[in-house]
Amino acid sequence: MTIILATGGTGGHVFPAITLAKALKVQGHNCILFTDQKTINIESYILPLCKPSGNKLKFLFLLMYSCVLALYQTRKLKPKLIIGFGSYASFPTLLAAKILSIPIVLHEQNTVLGRVNRFFFKSAKLIATSFPETKYAEGSKCVFTGNFVDIEAQGYSRAETVLNVLIIAGSQGANFFDDVVSSVICDLPVEVKERIRVTQQCTKKNINKVKSLYKSEGIDCELSEFFDDMENKLANAHLVISRAGATSIAEITLAERPAVYIPYPHSKDNHQFYNAKHIEDSGAAVMVEQNSNAKKNLGELLVDLLQNCQKLRDMANNTKKTRIRNGVTEFIKAIAQELS
């Protein structure tokens, strides 16, 4: 059957949709992504949206225009199901589903049900969550499946000489990682800097600056705007420093890697804080909030962790307590049961 997946906004919404689409295609379904993302290697229909944080009038105009386009394309494709992944980019397609009386299933990646998913909550036949406890996701329609990621645990390797530190900035507030996190790494004690190798996701405009900074401190590094071999990077990491987006957390936790999470302070409903807290409460990560004390707190924490390999191993083992899981199979079972 034809299934439309409504997604967009950030990679945290898009990547799970792509993972699910690939799994559904294997089962013979025709999947099409309705999204605002233009560089994804899967069949998709692009909606001309812009981010709501910019020009408000432009956003509202493009949102209304996208609603008309989504309605037209949806009526033309006649899908049997529309799956929403949250974010403003999913709104036009989910609205079309409601108008055309097409069954809606929602997937929430974060520990707080997003605003668009809350808006369509009553219209949905099923709401699947990535965390065992999700704020605003209550009732018989809600089921914990897990997030959708292509990561498998490979065991935590003991660091004999070099400690590999993986830094994942994500798409929101990446300049903080380029500037503050890199500066903290360079201010570590000499005996720590001599042992570490940094693999870091940087914004394109800052790669040369950050590389020069590390070089001046004698720190071995690999920098890139995007890593297309994230599973391999995680497998080699002894510690990960990351934003607390749900998909990043799922990948890091399923890879059984200890982490330091720095939640993006402007995330809607402060969901990154609650994402990180869930993992911290399980002993698999430590959270550092982005505030005036962030540089000092992060520096002290990294000195402690990078000089205590046993603590890193304990955190890696605690990832098994988080209940984070790859939910593709469970989700497909749930929607099959719901639509049967």
UniProtKB/Swiss-Prot annotation:
Cell wall formation. Catalyzes the transfer of a GlcNAc subunit on undecaprenyl-pyrophosphoryl-MurNAc-pentapeptide (lipid intermediate I) to form undecaprenyl-pyrophosphoryl-MurNAc-(pentapeptide)GlcNAc (lipid intermediate II). GO terms for molecular function: UDP-N-acetyl-D-glucosamine:N-acetylmuramoyl-L-alanyl-D-glutamyl-meso-2,6-diaminopimelyl-D-alanyl-D-alanine-diphosphoundecaprenol 4-beta-N-acetylglucosaminlytransferase activity; undecaprenyldiphospho-muramoylpentapeptide beta-N-acetylglucosaminyltransferase activity. It is an enzyme of class 2 (transferase). The gene is murG. GO terms for cellular component: plasma membrane. Its EC number is 2.4.1.227. Gene3D superfamilies: Glycogen Phosphorylase B. It comes from the Bacteria. It catalyses: di-trans,octa-cis-undecaprenyl diphospho-N-acetyl-alpha-D-muramoyl-L-alanyl-D-glutamyl-meso-2,6-diaminopimeloyl-D-alanyl-D-alanine + UDP-N-acetyl-alpha-D-glucosamine = di-trans,octa-cis-undecaprenyl diphospho-[N-acetyl-alpha-D-glucosaminyl-(1->4)]-N-acetyl-alpha-D-muramoyl-L-alanyl-D-glutamyl-meso-2,6-diaminopimeloyl-D-alanyl-D-alanine + UDP + H(+). It is found in: Cell membrane. The keyword Hydrolase does not apply. Pathway: Cell wall biogenesis; peptidoglycan biosynthesis. One of its GO terms (biological process) is carbohydrate metabolic process. Belongs to the glycosyltransferase 28 family. MurG subfamily. This is UDP-N-acetylglucosamine--N-acetylmuramyl-(pentapeptide) pyrophosphoryl-undecaprenol N-acetylglucosamine transferase. Keywords: Cell cycle, Cell division, Cell membrane, Cell shape, Cell wall biogenesis/degradation, Glycosyltransferase, Membrane, Peptidoglycan synthesis, Transferase. InterPro entries: GlcNAc_MurG, Glyco_trans_28_C, GlycoTrans_28_N. It is a peripheral membrane protein.
